[in-house]
C-alpha cells in the first residue's frame, strides 16, 4: 500500500460527522444550506458538472423548494487517508429517491470521492465528486429535474 496513511480516530469521527451532516441536509429539505459545508474554494462535481460554492448555493436553493421529493442516502466503506494537510476520502453510497421507479430500489449506487480541509477548527469539503456506478441515468435525470425546477 503506497502512501497509505490512515487518519486518527478523532479526525475520522469529525469527517464522518461532516459527511453525515451533508447527507442529512440533502435528505431533510435543507439543501439550501449545504454550501456552508464547503471551503471558500470548494467544488462539487457530479451530474450537473462542476459547481463552485456559489453555484452550489444556487442549486441548493432550487432543491430546497422541491419539498415533495423524498430521498435517503446510505453510506459505508469510508476510507480516509492523509494527503499533506488535507484528507482524501472515498465513501460508498446508496441513494433511494421516490421519483425513481420502483422507489424501493436504489436510484443510484456509487462513491463520493472527496477531499477535506480543516478551516477555523472545522472540517470542510474542498472537493466532492459524485461518481454513480449503477443508476447513473437516474442520477442525471434527477439533476435535470432540479435544474429545471420540476419536482416529479
Question: How should these model regions be labeled?
Answer:
Residues 1-37:
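Short, low-complexity N-terminal intrinsically disordered segments enriched in polar/charged residues
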Residues 13, 69-71, 105-107:
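Transmembrane beta-barrel outer-membrane domains
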Residues 31-95:
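A solvent-exposed, acidic/Ser-Thr-rich amphipathic alpha-helical stretch
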Residues 73-75, 107-112:
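Short, surface-exposed coil-to-beta transition loops
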Residues 95-99, 118:
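Beta-strand elements of well-folded, non-transmembrane domains
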Residues 136-152:
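Acidic/histidine-enriched, glycine/proline-rich intrinsically disordered or flexible terminal extensions
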Amino acid at each position: 500500500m503506497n502512501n497509505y496513511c490512515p487518519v486518527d480516530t478523532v479526525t475520522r469521527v469529525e469527517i464522518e460527522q461532516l459527511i453525515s451532516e451533508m447527507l442529512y441536509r440533502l435528505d431533510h429539505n435543507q439543501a439550501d444550506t449545504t454550501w456552508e459545508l464547503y471551503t471558500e474554494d470548494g467544488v462539487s462535481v457530479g451530474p450537473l458538472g462542476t459547481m463552485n460554492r456559489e453555484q452550489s448555493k444556487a442549486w441548493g436553493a432550487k432543491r430546497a423548494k422541491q419539498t415533495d421529493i423524498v430521498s435517503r442516502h446510505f453510506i459505508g466503506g469510508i476510507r480516509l487517508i492523509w494527503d499533506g494537510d488535507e484528507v482524501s476520502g472515498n465513501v460508498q453510497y446508496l441513494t433511494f429517491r421516490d421519483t425513481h421507479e420502483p422507489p424501493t430500489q436504489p436510484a443510484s449506487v456509487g462513491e463520493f470521492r472527496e477531499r477535506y480541509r480543516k478551516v477555523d477548527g472545522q472540517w470542510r469539503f474542498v472537493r466532492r465528486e459524485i461518481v454513480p456506478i449503477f443508476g447513473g441515468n437516474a442520477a442525471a435525470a434527477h439533476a435535470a429535474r432540479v435544474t429545471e425546477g420540476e419536482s416529479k
